[in-house]
């Protein structure tokens, strides 16, 4: 199965208009489903969601949850809890771990763990992101 997503044009403070690779993903937890446009980030180890998206999915910090800290560009630590849910990309549903950020100021990222091993992902000349299984 092949799925294609157009790059999204956005403003950059430094570069002006830029095209960024995105995909439409449905996050599923219990009976809750949320459709989001996420950045496809081959540099991200794990899928990252902001606090509000996790709350909409019904996430809570449980007694067995461990608050970790992850870092990206700039080495600024972000408190997260690893959660499991289902992701639907096109017609394919996968079990995935996500880093639920305990702060709001993070982008939605589709990271490598549990996702990239299932698809061939190709970035086509700043036009499309193609997922093929």
PLM feature spans:
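Pepsin/retropepsin-fold aspartyl endopeptidases
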Residues: 1-133
